[in-house]
A protein has these predicted regions:
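Non-catalytic DNA-recognition/assembly elements of restriction-modification systems
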Residues: 1-23, 48, 146, 150-158, ...
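Generic alpha-helical structural signal
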Residues: 13, 72, 112, 158-161, ...
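DNA target-recognition domains and sequence-specific DNA-contacting regions of bacterial/archaeal
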Residues: 13-149
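A generic structural signal for alpha-helix starts
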Residues: 7, 108-109, 122, 154-155, ...
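Hydrophobic structural patches
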Residues: 1-2, 160-171
Length: 182
């Protein structure tokens, strides 16, 4: 990231087409949940790089009667409240509860690069500077939007993500070997 930071930096707001928090439909209204088919993401679902399954669902009516919105697949799902920084890339369209942002990447942004950027120590440090403490810690999107971030070309973004994928794969193999030897 250090090499990237020597180039021009852009506000985070230029990295996405759409971004926003979700919302939780009123839990006492059973019609918002019973036989729901829309994946409803909570913080515990953000435990892996790729969001490939979840346990909670809401109905179309539940989505309409709350501030939840349908986040398209291949977006970044980022916790900006309470457990700030939990992050995944969704493999299918989802809705989220409040305190979790859906970030739909701009056309010049590789979702894998956006994931790496938002997972970086640089981004975490910048987030820690803007956290508002009230009832719970929150990093508001209006403040996140001002974080300056490196934006390499699409080809460079792909090179970066390919390199990190190779490193992650090698680490995974090494960890598996260590488990086997122990």
């Amino acid at each position: 990231m250090t090499v990237l930071l020597k180039g021009k930096l852009y506000p985070f707001s230029s990295f996405y087409i759409k971004a926003g928090e979700g919302g939780t439909p009123t839990t006492s209204v059973v019609e918002y949940y019973t036989e729901g088919t829309i994946p409803f993401i909570k913080i515990e679902d953000l435990s892996c790089k790729y969001l490939t399954n979840n346990k909670d669902f809401i109905t179309e009516l539940g989505m309409q009667k709350s501030s939840a919105w349908l986040i398209p697949s291949k977006s970044v799902i980022y916790s900006n409240g309470a457990t700030i920084g939990a992050i995944s890339i969704n493999e299918y369209p989802v809705c989220t509860k409040q305190g979790i942002l859906g970030i739909v990447p701009n056309t010049n942004i590789n979702v894998e690069y956006l994931y790496l950027l938002m997972s970086s120590s640089y981004f975490s440090k910048e987030i820690s500077r803007i956290i508002t403490e009230g009832t719970m810690k929150t990093a508001y999107l209006k403040d996140i939007n001002h974080i300056k971030c490196p934006l390499p070309s699409m080809a460079q973004q792909k090179n970066i993500t390919n390199l990190t994928s190779s490193i992650e794969e090698k680490l995974s193999i090494e960890q598996e070997l260590l488990r086997f030897l122990n």
